[in-house]
């Protein structure tokens, strides 16, 4: 696993904040993935999200502030460049 740190919530003063990485696995057929750290969704949000996409036990719903769009776009760009 080659984990590339992209950035944290720009309005934070330090640790314990939403963050974005790209996992760039090595090996044939391995595809990169976005790795996101965010706030856990509350029960009401989980219930609403389940209406559109039921969540298995192996997944989590998190919240990430919209001010992190730049970091998420950068992570997406890294993934796209790796697939050229």
Predicted features along the sequence, with ranges:
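Helix-rich interaction surfaces within compact, conserved domain-sized segments
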Residues: 38, 47-84
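A short, structured beta-strand/loop element
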Residues: 14-59
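Short Pro/Gly-enriched beta-strand edge/turn motifs at strand-loop
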Residues: 1-7
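Short Gly/Pro-enriched turn/cap motifs at secondary-structure boundaries
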Residues: 8-12
